[in-house]
Amino acid sequence: MNGISLDQPGSGSLDRERGPVDAPRAEPRRLAVMTFAADKDYLALARMTAMHVAGLLGLPIGRVTDLRLAVDEACSLFLAGPSGPDAPLLASSRAAESATLTLRFDRLAEHLRISVSGPLPLRRPDEDDLGWTMLCALVGSPRWEVRDGVGTLTLTEPIPTGRA
C-alpha cells in the first residue's frame, strides 16, 4: 500500500519509500463513509466496502471475512421486522422508500471502528437473537445506542501492530 493515503487531502505527507506519514492525532481518521438505501439489495455494497477497508489495513483474510459477515449482519438488523407479536416497536412508522443507512469506517490508534446508523429498526436488537450472537462471535462486544431517533451499531476490530 506504499504511496496511497486514505486520509483526507492535506492531513499527512507522503514518503516514497515508507508510504503515508501521518502527524500524530488525537481524533480517529475517517477511512470511508457510505450512505445507501436501507434495502437488502444494497447489502453487497456494504460487504464489499468492509472487505476492501479491512484488506487495506492488512488484516488477515480470516478477519476480513469475519468483518464482512459482521457488517452484513449489522446492516441487516436495521432491515429486520418484528420477530413476533410481542416484539417491542421502536419506530411506529417510517418511510421505507427514503430510509438510508450510513456505514462509517474510522481508524483509531490500534483499532478499526465500524459504525452503522440509520432510522430506528422496528425492533431493538435482542441479545438472544441469532444475529446478535453472530455479531458477538465475530467482533466481540457490539455497542447499540439510540440518539435523536437514530440507531447506531458500533463494531470495533483490533488492527495488528505495524500495519497501515
Mark where each language-model region is.
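Short alpha-helix boundary/capping segments
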Residues: 38, 59-62, 126-130
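Conserved beta-strand-loop-beta-strand hairpin that lines the nucleotide-binding pocket
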Residues: 1-33, 77-164
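Conserved short strand/loop->alpha-helix "switch" segment adjacent to the catalytic nucleotide/phosphoryl-transfer site
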Residues: 47-73
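STAS-typified acidic loop motif
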Residues: 33-45
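Glycine-/small-residue-rich active-site loops that bind phosphorylated ligands and cofactors
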Residues: 42, 64, 123
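Short, flexible active-site loop motifs that bind/organize anionic cofactors or intermediates
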Residues: 33-36, 54-57, 125
